[in-house]
């Protein structure tokens, strides 16, 4: 991520990575190899359309039919996103949970959250104590109602109280479940992480993730730049990609901005 001067700026940068998470990917896809390359494809397509004004995804299976983008260009760009983790495998073995990352807090924000957490814990303890008391009283009433020699008037009175306690317990169960689900916690947002071992991507022949071709070093679209970025081994290269996209010498980004401004003139 970009350098940041404040905790708030750091949090905003993390939230911004949610752009790569959003989309219509089938995260329950049974073929996980296909799921992975589909996610990479979607992230690349979003980036291409939003910032470069080009449908790069058309070159996934072959050289672009209209724009000057080769299949090699596609996989050079795709490599930047290969090292980005969007979904992950849970402890239950389900590889379909979207990444939710914790956001940093200022001291004031943390103090405010601590206050809310204490108030929530106190309320939850009170609700559970009320439920326990209601359960205990209902059990006592059930035992009394088992007596065969209870006067009719007394039985009616005890039955009414027992039924009221049963309703009360159901209500408290719902309140406790709701309170536990919406408990205050560390602020979170959908976002992405770099994988432990990022790297270049192999060409998938005709888009088939199980038919692999040669490895293509990460790089930019040759139509706009022939430069090869220097990427640290433990990083995905998204930082270098962002620098290239926003660079003064990138004619594609400039064209997109001009067209958007012209649209509003």
Q: Which residue ranges define each predicted feature?
A:
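General structural signal for alpha-helix termini and helix-helix connectors
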Residues: 3, 60-64, 147, 247
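Short amphipathic alpha-helical surface patches that mediate protein-protein
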Residues: 1-2, 82, 263
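Low-complexity, Lys/Gly-biased intrinsically disordered segments
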Residues: 1-10, 209
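Sequence context surrounding c-type heme c attachment/ligation sites in exported
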Residues: 6-111, 118
